[in-house]
Amino acid sequence: MDLITIACLDMAGTTVADDGGVLAAFAAAIGRCGLAEGTPARDRAMKTAEVTMGQSKIEVFRQIFSDEADAQRANAAFEECYAAAVAAGGVEALPGAAEVMARLGEAGIRVCLATGFAPATRDAIIDKLGWRPLIDLALSPADAGRGRPWPDIPLTALLRLGGGAVSELAVVGDTPSDIESGRRAGAGLVAGVLTGRASREELAEAKAAVILDSVAGLPSALGLSA
């Protein structure tokens, strides 16, 4: 493995605890857009939300709703519901996440937080958790062009943070989409974590190079001393 200079860390499920909050916001959003509980259409929509965890939220809603206006309305409702949960204190850091970001910074590794949330929601989470001093960059699909599983976010992190080669990137996430994004970007290390919804088998099938119990194991995977 080449020397890692940039770590691109996913948020919900990787550094931020997700105790069903994302799916709850999805459920509320599609309910506002007419998909009532107990209907086949709602069941299909929730299944889509589950299998696309980690991807750009607007792209997920475009899969659910054929009309662009409906997709945009659902996305706005999702962001509103999730932001309300954040404001009410319904967001917590996963154990060790802040310490890992601090340790990476001490080692000269720049930290980018990556997410499928809109920038406003992303920034509200970061500020709520007090992480601004720990990171160098935060990116959403709107900042990079396309969300996961495309490579745009890690490649944008590389460019904005002055990396010299894709092999300097470490991409860490809890979903197969995170892993695919990192692999497509050519990252030097693509690591899965087991703190989200994906199983070890699913992350292995996505070809994660390393599977960690949590992001707390990242410094060791990078060869950093305690």
PLM regions and their residue ranges:
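Conserved G/P- and acidic residue-centered "switch" motifs that form tight phosphate/ATP-binding loops
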Residues: 14, 115, 174
